[in-house]
Amino acid sequence: MIYIDNRQNKIKVNEELENKIKEIIDYALKEEKVNIDYEISVVFIDNNSIKEINKDYRNIDKATDVLSFPMLDYEEGEVFKDIYLNYEFDESDLDEGNLVLGDIALSLEKAEEQSKEFGHSFLRETCYLTIHSVLHLLGYDHMEEDEKVIMRQREEEILKSFNLHR
């Protein structure tokens, strides 16, 4: 189950965008071997809202493009398919039968700014940020160079499947 909640009014959100986001998330999770019913919440917000969240949770006083709040625990360098592929989740891990993977807060305002800066479409940027965040929910990171290379490769492979290029 994918929940999308639009809590901003600076960028128009249409059904096409919401459907593409859901399609990208579903595809990415299948590619990453998530073989259980899941729940992810995506909240579309503006720069002021994401700045406040950054300040509250990361002690960073600026707007960023996307934030991920994973619900599962991962050791450094491990991702979902490494440790949870055949894991027996118990009822305390599930919400109405769905594994709660986490929440995504995405600034559509920042996505629009970055799409112009990088010279590609708003849809491509929003899909990229969604994939990036989903991979974080699955344990991927980019703090170390080797992890960054792996994460970027996965992002590009998924984008390519949807014919979304830079």
Swiss-Prot record:
| Primary localization | cytoplasm
* Gene Ontology CC annotation, any one: cytoplasm
How would you classify this enzyme at the top EC level?
A: hydrolase
This molecule's function is given as: Single strand-specific metallo-endoribonuclease involved in late-stage 70S ribosome quality control and in maturation of the 3' terminus of the 16S rRNA.
Binding locations of Zn(2+): H132, H136, H142
Q: Which PROSITE patterns match?
A: UPF0054 (PS01306)
Xref: Pfam families: YbeY
Give the subcellular location. Cytoplasm
Q: Which PANTHER family match?
A: ENDORIBONUCLEASE YBEY, CHLOROPLASTIC
InterPro entries hit by this protein: MetalPrtase_cat_dom_sf_prd (IPR023091), YbeY (IPR002036), YbeY_CS (IPR020549)
Top-rank taxon of the source lineage equals Bacteria
SUPFAM superfamilies, per this entry? Metalloproteases ('zincins'), catalytic domain
Q: What is this protein called?
A: Endoribonuclease YbeY
Q: List required co-factors.
A: Zn(2+)
A GO BP entry is:
rRNA processing
Q: Which gene encodes it?
A: ybeY
Record EC number: 3.1.-.-
Cofactor: binding details: Binds 1 zinc ion.
Question: What keywords sit in the KW lines?
Answer: Cytoplasm, Endonuclease, Hydrolase, Metal-binding, Nuclease, Ribosome biogenesis, rRNA processing, Zinc
Please report which protein family the annotation says this sequence is part of: Belongs to the endoribonuclease YbeY family.
Single GO MF annotation: metalloendopeptidase activity
